[in-house]
Regions:
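Cell wall/extracellular polymer interaction/catalysis modules
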Residues: 1-158, 167-181, 185
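Short cysteine clusters
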Residues: 161
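A conserved hydrophobic position in a structured secondary element of the catalytic/binding core
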Residues: 164
Length: 185
């Protein structure tokens, strides 16, 4: 199974485009650009890859549409955005078991197969935007739970996601819709 993906973008110019480029000399950090905004971002612990695999810790090199969003109640206050944001509940999980039929899909507890909890003790998923990596065209073992979320202190590496500081996420959110494309170069 090949996990790389060619992206052909024949969309209209009115679609918001975010570009993420590796920061000079830093494998796990990036500069996220949206129009005139240039924001510091965290990447996966293995940097960027063209051949994403489950558990490799890499951020996929791809163009991904922002398809849905979640938020942790109360932590970030009111958020202005063009995305529909659902509040994260205690029973919300994300399946990361490649052999399971619900692979790379949201699921509810109790759930026996390998999964990630969306209610975290840290702030990472205070805002959690699902990017269309391996969702619309799902392939087992090609990576799951590739999100656009809040960064750890010091922009420590993610498990393959793209992450911003809370202030920068709040700054960018008003411009985002379900037509926004995020490109990792």
């Amino acid at each position: 199974v090949t996990c790389s993906r060619k992206t052909t973008d024949k969309s209209h110019s009115k679609i918001a485009r975010i570009v993420v480029r590796r920061a000079p000399g830093k494998v796990t950090q990036a500069i996220l650009q949206y129009g005139p905004l240039r924001l510091r971002a965290a990447l996966g612990r293995s940097g960027i890859t063209s051949c994403k695999r489950e558990g490799d810790g890499a951020t996929p090199r791809a163009t991904m549409r922002l398809i849905s969003a979640y938020r942790r109640g109360g932590r970030m206050g009111a958020l202005a955005t063009g995305l529909t944001m659902r509040r994260i509940r205690n029973d919300m999980l994300w399946c990361d078991a490649p052999a399971h039929p619900a692979y790379n899909r949201p699921v509810r507890a109790p759930f026996a197969a390998s999964h990630e909890k969306l209610t975290r003790d840290d702030r990472l998923y205070d805002v959690c935007i699902v990017m269309d990596w391996n969702i619309t065209e799902r392939r087992r073992g090609c990576g799951s739970a590739i999100f656009f979320h809040i960064a750890r202190e010091g922009y420590a590496p993610t498990e393959g996601c793209v992450a911003l500081s809370p202030a920068d996420m709040r700054r960018l959110l008003p411009y985002l819709t379900d037509r926004t494309l995020l490109t990792v170069l």
